[in-house]
Amino acid sequence: MRSLDYAKVITKLVSFIQEKVEESNVKGVILGISGGVDSATVAYLAARAIGKEKVLGLVMPYHINRDVEDALLVCNNLGINYKVINIKSIVNEFEKNLDFELNNVSRGNIMSRTRMILLYAHANSKNYLVLGTSNRSEFLTGYFTKWGDSASDYAPLINLYKTEVWNIARILGVPNEIINKKPSAGLWEGQTDEKDLGITYKLLDEILYRLVDLKMKKENIARELNIPLNKVEYVESLIKKSEHKRKLPIGPEI
Amino acid sequence: MRSLDYAKVITKLVSFIQEKVEESNVKGVILGISGGVDSATVAYLAARAIGKEKVLGLVMPYHINRDVEDALLVCNNLGINYKVINIKSIVNEFEKNLDFELNNVSRGNIMSRTRMILLYAHANSKNYLVLGTSNRSEFLTGYFTKWGDSASDYAPLINLYKTEVWNIARILGVPNEIINKKPSAGLWEGQTDEKDLGITYKLLDEILYRLVDLKMKKENIARELNIPLNKVEYVESLIKKSEHKRKLPIGPEI
C-alpha cells in the first residue's frame, strides 16, 4: 500500500470539513453513526474540526444489536448530540406498500435510503451539511447502496482505503472494540462486508491500489502479491460491474 | 433557442433507451408517472423504444388531485402496466419519527425520495432500470430534490430544455391537457414550478441556453432578449447556488 503521513492526512481531513462548513454557510454537520469504524472516524474528525456542539449523530438501527451500543459509545465518548431513531416502522411501511417479497439486499437498500432521508430531513431543518462515511474500497467496488449510504453532501473518507481508515481511527482514539470488530453494513443479521465481498479488505486494498492508482498489469499484481490471477480479475470485475454506481444519470447528447 | 430536428432527437432518445436496456441486461424499465409532461414524455419514449409490455409506471400520489387522473390517462393511453401507491402513509411514518415540524419543502423532499425508494424496490425485484424524468432546465437551476427525483439509472431528457420537452411531447401524442397544464412538482397544493422559480420556463430556457450553452455575456443576453440585466443575473445565481446538486459527494485528495 502507499505510505501515508497520517498526521498530515488527518490535518487535511479536518480542514476539508472546516472549509466545506464555512463555504456552505451552514451551522454544523450531521452523519449516521452505525457503530462501525467509518462513521466513528468521520464523527471524531468532525468533532475535532468544528467542535462537538456542531455535530449531530443519528443512530438509526433496524436490528437491535451490539452496533447500537458501539454507536452510542462513539457519541458519548465525543460528547456530541445524538438521536436514536429505529427505522423498522418506516421500512415496514414501505414493505406494506409493495405487493412482492423483499430479499435481504432489497430490504437493505430500503434501510440505507431511509437513513439518507432521515439525515436530510434533519439537515434541512437545522441548516446542517450531511457528511457521508463511504471509503474508497467501497466506492471502487460498488459495495454501497446507490442513492443510499453513498448519498451525502461531502464524503471526507472517499479517497481513503478501508485499511487506511483503520489506521486513522486508531490515531484519533476511536475505541478498539469498534476498530477490531468485523466490518458490517448491518443490513441483515450476521452480515459481514468481507463475506459479501468474498475477499478481505487487506488483500482487496492491495489489489485496488495497484490496479486503479498504479495502473499495474493484472499479471504483475498477481506475481507481486503472490496470489492467483483470478483474485485480481475478480476485483477488476467488481469495479467494472459497479461503474454505473459512480456516476450521475446521463441522457443522450442533443 | 436552438433549432432542433425533433424527428432526429426522438430517434436518438428511443435508441438511447434501447441501448441502455440491452447494455444493462435488464428486462424492462420503470418510471414514476406524475401526471406531468416530463414523465409522460419519457413513458411515451420508453413504450416506443422497448414495447409497452416492458414499461412499468408507478403512480405515487401524496395529494389526491387531477394529477392522478392525468397519470392514469398516460398509462391507459399507452397500455403500459402500472401501479398506484399512495405514499402518504410512508411519509407520515417518517414524520412520526421526527421531533420537529416539517415545512413544505422538507416534506416535498421526503415525498420525492420516498418515490425513489419505491421505484428502486420494484426495479430490484423485476430486474428493471429506473428511468429518470429530469430535464435540462431543472438540472441547471437545481429545481429538483437531491437524491430524489434526480436519482435514477438513466435520464433520457436531461439534455433537453423544458420548452423542448413540450415540443417532443406534442409530436409523440402526449394528451394536450397534460402538455397545456401549469407545470408542477405537486409537492404541495397549488404549487407551480414557475411560481417557485420566479420566472417562466420560456424565458428561463432562452437565458439558460445563451448563458450555459452559448456562453454569452450577461449584458448581451439582456440586450438580445430585451430584458433587465437582473433577470439574467437571477438565473445565473440559481445555477451557482445549485452547483453542489449536480455532483457526487467529494472528499479531499490524498
Swiss-Prot record, chains A, B:
Q: Which reaction does it catalyse?
A: deamido-NAD(+) + NH4(+) + ATP = AMP + diphosphate + NAD(+) + H(+)
Enzyme class, spelled out: ligase
Species this protein is from:
Thermococcus sibiricus (strain DSM 12597 / MM 739)
Instruction: Give me the Gene Ontology terms describing cellular component.
Output: cytoplasm
Function noted in UniProt? Catalyzes the ATP-dependent amidation of deamido-NAD to form NAD. Uses ammonia as a nitrogen source.
Q: Which GO terms describe its biological process?
A: NAD biosynthetic process
Per the record, the gene is nadE
What one GO molecular function would you report for this record? Answer: metal ion binding
Q: Which UniProt keywords apply?
A: ATP-binding, Ligase, Magnesium, Metal-binding, NAD, Nucleotide-binding
- Quote the CDD domains the UniProt record gives: NAD_synthase
Record-stated family:
Belongs to the NAD synthetase family.
Report quaternary structure and partners: Homodimer.
Q: In which pathway does it act?
A: Cofactor biosynthesis; NAD(+) biosynthesis; NAD(+) from deamido-NAD(+) (ammonia route): step 1/1
Query: For Mg(2+), which residues are the binding ones?
Result: D38, E138
Q: Provide the residue positions that the database annotates as binding ATP.
A: G32, I33, S34, G35, G36, V37, D38, S39, T133, K162, S184
Question: Which residues does deamido-NAD(+) bind?
Answer: R113, K146, D153, H244, K245
Q: What is this protein called?
A: NH(3)-dependent NAD(+) synthetase
